[in-house]
């Protein structure tokens, strides 16, 4: 996707925007918490980052944050929470052409549905 000006930076946000804003750091904080196995803290950081990216029009970063929230819920063994985030991220990942993440999200969504219905 492109911005109103038709230019995008490497983070999926409007070009010329400082990547070192609060939203950017919340995303990095979520990544750090994930790396340390602190998935609940990661979820909170990613959710806040997703809100910021959405308001900034950074569609790629927004979609990836939604997916990261789902990943964190799956790491906690909470497929019922991951389900909604996967469903929200899938159309965005598809639209943005993020095929690798879209494929992962589809697999995770199928796994969530399987776990929730008791069919393995």
Task: Go through each PLM region and give its residues.
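Single-residue signature of alpha-solenoid repeat helices
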Residues: 3-6, 42, 82
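Hydrophobic/aromatic packing residues within the alpha-helices of TPR/SEL1-like helical repeat arrays
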Residues: 7-10, 46, 53, 86, ...
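Short coil/turn linkers that connect adjacent helices within long alpha-helical scaffolds
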Residues: 12-19, 52-60, 92-100
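TPR/TPR-like (Sel1-like) alpha-helical repeat modules
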Residues: 79-97, 110
